Amino acid sequence: MEEFVRQCFNPMIVELAEKAMKEYGEDRKIETNKFAAICTHLEVCFMYSDFHFINEQGESIIVELDDPNALLKHRFEIIEGRDRTMAWTVVNSICNTTGAEKPKFLPDLYDYKENRFIEIGVTRREVHIYYLEKANKIKSEKTHIHIFSFTGEEMATKADYTLDEESRARIKTRLFTIRQEMASRGLWDSFRQSERGEETIEERFEITGTMRRLADQSLPPNFSCLENFRAYVDGFEPNGYIEGKLSQMSKEVNAKIEPFLKTTPRPIKLPDGPPCSQRSKFLLMDALKLSIEDPSHEGEGIPLYDAIKCMRTFFGWKEPYVVKPHDKGINPNYLLSWKQLLAELQDIENEEKIPRTKNMKKTSQLKWALGENMAPEKVDFDDCRDISDLKQYDSDEPELRSLSSWIQNEFNKACELTDSIWIELDEIGEDVAPIEHIASMRRNYFTAEVSQCRATEYIMKGVYINTALLNASCAAMDDFQLIPMISKCRTKEGRRKTNLYGFIIKGRSHLRNDTDVVNFVSMEFSLTDPRLEPHKWEKYCVLEIGDMLLRSAIGQVSRPMFLYVRTNGTSKIKMKWGMEMRRCLLQSLQQIESMIEAESSVKEKDMTKEFFENKSETWPIGESPKGVEEGSIGKVCRTLLAKSVFNSLYASPQLEGFSAESRKLLLVVQALRDNLEPGTFDLGGLYEAIEECLINDPWVLLNASWFNSFLTHALR
């Protein structure tokens, strides 16, 4: 074959092909078919460009080389055949002068008439298969693809063949001649069968010196050098090999690897049952705040003082009554607990000096609500050794719940903007080194996008409640301490605001281990009528406690004010994580940064400013039954933040399991989208693992529903 190449092709082409193979560390004497393929490709590129010029009027003309007018501008810039550094220099220069988008891979030609890069393909296989491989590798609509075959077929982007019929016929004739010459020498079959699919790695990294010796030393047994190992890996067909290995390991294991196709995956099955209910530690979209602006009262900053001041802003209190009972609870006790709280707050106000903290009287209703004396008595294991039928008590299987629309509404609300600013600019850590000015610029842009987001309010509320509850749990272990649920923010005009959402009363809290539970009763204000979505409020007893005057378009309207009361519990470890909810800001900032980095590496400059300031550009936010939802960069920031915050608010073993297992399916689907031909075994087992996490948790059910939307659109 090498001899044929030297006879058949122009010496300049042969020399360029030798250089190219040397640059990629390939041996022309061993890889003779590749040598022939490179020469053929080079010749087609040169023939494509030959005789094509642009005249002074900017029109494309064909001129034979001995014509005196041959000083005209060449229509095509040849990039193929140059060494890599030079080729990229040419590409960059073209991009700078013409404004063309820089390609990710080195193209073969640039067409000055059509102002586009061209990728030339010469294939021994079907043209459309090779075309799709090229298109999939390049992933750019800006680069024009033109494929020729040795059988006279061709294919080009949008059937735009660039050249006139005669020029293309010359190329096809030459390819047909090469094929016939090879066939007459008995070389064609080997050459035809040796074509491999389009490689997506555009350059082979050459390892030399110490690193090369280390690589040779660290090979698996039976491999003498890195090249042999590379050849083995390149030609490795994993599926049959893995099946064989598995069957050797155990007679029970029988893993038949099945191809994963567009029709393979089915939707995740969501459970049937009554609708799921709200399980967050505090109200989210339904919360109501009693607020004071520019607080300057005595003791400002002391929670109890702030709470009393906020309570005084409301004048519509009325005799409370139960509007939505808690099915399993003693509802009069919840009502009595609220009345007790009001009475004890009144007592404080009547005192000369308001105390810094308030411990509630241990009344029967609070003892019941806080589970006092309800825990089974702990017995030392040594005292039970002799009991023959000792066993752990049976616990009921959790009841399956179905997805309900309220959790999607909660998420949508969390992504929205409020009319207050919840974090200062310095909330997300400080710069450590001067090199981080880009980091601080990104952080400031990001903070500006999320500082008014409702998810950010949830962060600050969560941090406050968990900090206060953990402090009280340690400082007043035996007391039923009253903890106001407070947050602080600024108005858009910069005025400070203190907000009261309601109160928590904590139970006994002798927390030795991280997982020991402290019970608490939460009482939270709201304007949401629980009768609209009773299933959401299954765990709550809801009282009507007053009437609030609200400004509306038609003047002042009176709306009933509700109090959502429930018994809840948390642990040291949960409170510790709750106190660190600000991490959600950091996590979503890092996700945004990776988007900016990807954009910057394509454009080869920092794109932070353009990323945040180009308001016209939209970005993918997520999947919905309608398709891929898009929005502004601010919306993307807020959506990512809301996801992170909900992962914290609704943290659970179900979420951990679903995230870990569904990720495996996601990776397989993404591999399919990238045409990597993935194979799977025991896909049914993976679905089982995913679906056993779908029990009753609203956030997990919503994520599963989103995942199904993604599957639908990803596999179209």
UniProtKB/Swiss-Prot annotation:
Keywords: Cap snatching, Endonuclease, Eukaryotic host gene expression shutoff by virus, Eukaryotic host transcription shutoff by virus, Host cytoplasm, Host gene expression shutoff by virus, Host nucleus, Host-virus interaction, Hydrolase, Inhibition of host RNA polymerase II by virus, Manganese, Metal-binding, Nuclease, Phosphoprotein. One of its GO terms (cellular component) is host cell nucleus. Phosphorylated on serines and threonines by host kinases, including human casein kinase II. Mn(2+) 1 binds at H41, D108, E119, I120. One of its GO terms (molecular function) is endonuclease activity. Its EC number is 3.1.-.-. It is an enzyme of class 3 (hydrolase). Mn(2+) 2 binds at E80, D108. It comes from the Viruses. Belongs to the influenza viruses PA family. This is Polymerase acidic protein. The gene is PA.
